[in-house]
């Protein structure tokens, strides 16, 4: 399963991403409430339908704040250039068996690859 970051969704809505369409069709896409929340803060066409569709996807395991703080310490993420929500997404992937994070955020991708948690799709 692939946890899709907001950067992938935004690019998909700008110009259809066939890789994402294939993953959705195969039932391989995970959502996360923080990604849905970030997207909800944007200007969405067909807002309610989009948010409902995201909420209807299988959801990644949500890490507690304590789990994320431990994850940050255990993986030396301080000073890595990622944000707290990014750390939450990586922790969620770690907690969701068989999942990977798909992002176009360069720093998040680099950390995800280092930790073996990133989906390295060819862009």
Feature names for model-found ranges:
Residues 1-34, 40-52, 58, 117-118, ...:
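Short, well-structured N-terminal submotif of metal-dependent ribonuclease cores
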Residues 12, 18, 59-123:
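Active-site neighborhoods of divalent-metal-dependent phosphate/nucleic-acid chemistry enzymes
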